[in-house]
Amino acid sequence: MKSVLMIGQSNMAGRGFINEVPMICNERIQMLRNGKWQMMTEPINYDRPISGVSLAGSFAAMWCMENKEEQIGLIPCAEGGSSIDDWSIEKILFKNAIIQAKFAMQNSNLIAILWHQGENDSYNGNYKTYYEKLHTIFETLKNELNLDDVPFIIGGLGDYLGKIGFGFNCTEYDLVNKELLRYANDHNHVYFVTAQGLSANPDGIHLNAVSQRKFGVRYYYAYKNKKNVITPLKNE
């Protein structure tokens, strides 16, 4: 079995409304829950009662389309509302991700780490230290999990931010995006995925279900082709 680690905040965990998109039903897509692999159902990353559709579902579905005989397992460790500081290597979210990944790796081969985080750091100039903090997280993950060329796929923040609802104060989202892209360009096996053109729920901060499906396809494209996705894909 192959496996994928999901880390970040609520748009990685997923807040898309489940009734807005067709169900992904595939016995070859598993998720880690209570220490056991079980068939994927959404929400995959149940961190809140409002958890819903995540980009990881369509990422895994795309992977299965091109790997006909294998299984893929999702390791959900994202936490809604978490800042980059909440993912510091001495704190519980990072430690939990390491524990869950090591447990999953006992009977799976980790092939990718999916990261989406930054809404909680898109104000008050927090982008200025984002690059260095992200580097510490990723380098420590690599060392702790003995990862050499496993890709880190990092998603950008939506251009709907800074306008309404809970996203109103996220006025520096574009500056965070620039740091994410700069990090991907500076490091091997790190690929940036744009959120350009994606849409939010009425709350103004969380990607809706259709956009989560599209985002997962973009993440997979970056993973498969080992390159940044800086514009929306055709026919996604």
For each feature predicted by the language model, list its residue ranges.
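Cell-envelope and extracellular/periplasmic
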Residues: 1-236
